Amino acid sequence: MLSPKRTRFRKQHRGRMKGISHRGNHISFGKYALQALEPAWITSRQIEAGRRAMTRNARRGGKIWVRIFPDKPVTLRPAETRMGSGKGSPEYWVAVVKPGRILYEMGGVTENIARRAISLAASKMPIRTQFIIS
């Protein structure tokens, strides 16, 4: 699972996702890509599941680039805890994804192999996505 080695602060505010992505919305490494169409938090487990699905499907051919990184900690309180007594401890990491963001890129394979591999990764994502070609 992906997570930062160290951060400046242990906990973050939730924030809000408005507008479209202005960074990371063009293909820059491979030839084929998976692009987000909705805003969401994507967990490090979901990113890893998508990456594994793509590598298994493509087998030894091609190269895969993961274009998002989970750098936001999500805190959780223990179950059946009374209100108050501070914010919970960080449990997992998420990547904040806005519409237009490239999630994965792929190169060195034919289009139908890339399409199949990327559709498997798309099924692991909690949002609607689209397959794009540079």
From Swiss-Prot:
GO terms for molecular function: rRNA binding; structural constituent of ribosome. Part of the 50S ribosomal subunit. The lineage of its organism: Eukaryota, Viridiplantae, Streptophyta, Embryophyta, Tracheophyta. NCBIfam families: rplP_bact. One of its GO terms (cellular component) is ribosome. This is Large ribosomal subunit protein uL16c. The gene is rpl16. It is found in: Plastid, Chloroplast. HAMAP family: Ribosomal_uL16. PANTHER family: 50S/60S RIBOSOMAL PROTEIN L16, LARGE RIBOSOMAL SUBUNIT PROTEIN UL16M. It comes from Nicotiana tabacum. One of its GO terms (biological process) is translation. Residues 1-22 are annotated as: Disordered. Transmembrane segments: none annotated. Keywords: Chloroplast, Plastid, Ribonucleoprotein, Ribosomal protein. Pfam families: Ribosomal_L16. Belongs to the universal ribosomal protein uL16 family.
